Amino acid sequence: HYAVFGGSPFINQALNPAATLRENIIDTVLNPMSSVYLYASQLVFADNALNVNAERIFFALGNDRKRYTEIEDALGVKKTGNLAKQIKTLTDHEILSRSIPINKPNDNKKATYELSDNLLRFYYTFVYKNTSALQVLGAEAFYDEFIAPALTDFIARCFEDICREYFSLQVRSGQMNGV
């Protein structure tokens, strides 16, 4: 559940602990009347500082555009530096995270961006770009068609991040060597 919904108490209170992941996704993220759906779809608009292009940036990230130039191309913006400021604002608010390859720490062109919030990452990967299909198909058929085939890969990314963090903590605390 964490890979999809994250750790927010607000979101986790809306989940049914007895339900499967599929059932919770259908009842919350795919239900336009649920507080979880409203949270994911309206978060950007709650803070005007984040509003400018944020939704379009999230959409680009949800479509596997991870590098700055890929985001820039997806948005079709001119190279004025405004996008860099917007990404910095989203990174400062911890909505986006920036990763730099360990072997190229000073190469900004190799940096990638991702949505930090698992729920937003899920929403912009599967739901946002397919909202009309959700309305036509209904939640269950939408899940089976758009989410189920890719869910394992989506969850794997979060699992890899958790494993990396675990080993990093083990090495820093001196409990593990040679990693």
Q: Which sequence ranges carry the predicted segments?
A:
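A short helix-loop-helix "switch/interaction" segment in the helical subdomain of ASCE P-loop NTPases
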Residues: H1-N12
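Accessory nucleic acid-recognition modules appended to NTPase machines
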Residues: I11, L15-P17, E23-V179
